[in-house]
């Protein structure tokens, strides 16, 4: 790939493909935590006698709260020097302000406010009963939730009369509704008991909030409307130890929103590493989850498998790799993947979402003495969507037993999100939930920021990007050729050591040739991205290092890629001890069908127009 015209064509193809693909824009939704704070600021005057709006805003900014309910707020009063107090605080806290007047006061207004990092979709003011002074409820609606702020009357009768209004307002929304503020009632008062029938208190009422210097009571709260509480998990609360800025202490609550059930799975599962009486089911979730697989020879009598690490269920990440062992060769199995979002994982408590289940899929492992199979091999797709779609249509027609992507099909992953998107796109297109997939690493999979992380999204035979597996009585050996330039090339910045990696594979090859599975196989196939013979680059370290061992190896064929130009080299024509078939690339894409029937092994190479480029009995 050193020729200028070829490099230019490749870059153009890759840029076209990536520009037209949503892969680069694909991001995972983070688990959605919301921090709500309520604070009666006493119009900004602290117990030290200072009226300091910047101090209040600084406290809120430092807390990291997403939404703040603020009580006792002046607006352009004489007492505030004509200042818009909430806006002054909001500017310091870097939040959007919303003010609700409860009454006119001192040349301006007095009431409650809400501050938020996110601009509300709408804001609503609702009057509440108040004998000693007018009271008000301020509601801000956001995309996923609502937050309401109030400062209830000092009079119990007014408090009780306010509760039906609070309930009516909350019931008008079909999303989580939080109520926060200074309610002028203690936890044992009848007002709190009445409110708690329909609202769930989220802060620890044993943590005292008033007065700020020496608190002896709790009158500040954050609560959640119970009918909308099902998909909200309380993750903790605290009272901030601020003794001077106001006569109340700020109360902070953190909650987490569970993902909708339909969003828990990132994509359907995909099968990896079939063999030795087992197969690996891989999937990713959009949130931290506990996953397991239910499987059996029918859909009614199911076993359960999960991944354990030192006796613990592996549920600390969004990547899931579950091995199904003890399977009977030649038997059809059905399986589904199950997951529960973990909303809160503490030492002595855990909170889960609903159990979500995929649909049932099926697969069958080959018997050890099985002679017949069909495998489809493609290479150098380079994210070209039209080629992927065409190959997927062909795969649906050909119905191969398994599929090999022979390198540069998942090039240059920059992030885990991008790698996941591209892998799952191919897996979905090629029915990877029911057809085992082998992803062979090409030189372009080695490049970019997440290249060293992407292997965790696969389960390779033997645990390496090289290895061997048997399909019936045929042995397949996979080699990872590494990069196509020397390790000391400037573009690698001293981060590569593929010479050592190739030496490791030489030792693997020497051991593989001694293995019973290799020696007793009726046929043997070598898969590698860069051709060991027929590589058009002058730099060919794999042939230099492995060629001697492979000269004596009884392979029936080598299937390779990399050059983007289809060519077939019969054994002995270029020093190759066995036939070498090299697949085409973007603009001249090809696919290979390797089919075995009885003792006969047949290779067919076609382009995407369906033209047969080569047919050969091996």
Regions found by a protein language model. Give the residues of each.
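Acidic, histidine-bearing metal-coordination/catalytic regions of metal-dependent phosphoesterases
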Residues: 3-8, 12-15, 23-37, 228, ...
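N-terminal, active-site-proximal structural segment of metallo-dependent hydrolase catalytic domains
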Residues: 23-91, 104-108, 164, 243, ...
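Metal-dependent phosphoester-hydrolase catalytic domains
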Residues: 26, 125-126, 156-158, 168-178, ...
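Structured beta-strand-rich core segments of catalytic domains in phosphoester-bond hydrolases
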Residues: 33, 48-49, 72-146, 235-241, ...
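Active-site beta-strand/loop signature of hydrolases that rely on acidic residues for catalysis
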Residues: 34-41, 56-81, 147-150, 166-194, ...
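Active-site environment of divalent metal-dependent phosphoester hydrolases
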Residues: 44-46, 75-79, 105-107, 155-160, ...
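Extended active-site neighborhood of metal-dependent phosphoesterases/phosphodiesterases
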Residues: 88-91, 110-116, 121-124, 337-362, ...
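His/acidic metal-ligating clusters that form di-metal
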Residues: 139-148, 159-198, 289-291, 398-402, ...
